[in-house]
Amino acid sequence: YVLARELGSKRYGDPDVKLREHPAEILPQEVDALRQMMLDLVQQPEHFQHWFGEFISQSRHELDLAPPEPPYQAGEIYELLQQGEALQRLGGLRVLRVGDRCFVNGELIDTDQLQAADALCQNFSVDAALLGDAVDDPSFLALLTALVNSGYWYFND
């Protein structure tokens, strides 16, 4: 998480460290200094919540993903939802809300459509009624299409 967001610009360093007889030895005070650096980062709520959401929503087992072939276009998903079809969540997929953010399998769902994101988090089956006005939002529909084409949600055949 730290490396992916380039938050690790502050690196551990000790200009007073002496050459050791055993180069693999790490002294307790060095471990304490590194631990303090990590605690300082964890004390920043925005970083901790984001890391926690990514970490806790990652599947611990391989998911039985079956991306649709051919992939759906956003217009197709829109039409199916308008016709009353419902999207089913893949079994074992972790979809969680941490604060006001939604995470799917270790990824932040970046949308302003919080009610629709909440519907994805709380329901194993979602339809146009649950998603509300979000289905008319092209950016949300693009996000939903990406989730379906990843195999995370699917339409029953």
Residues of each region from the PLM?
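Fe(II)/2-oxoglutarate
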Residues: Y1-D157
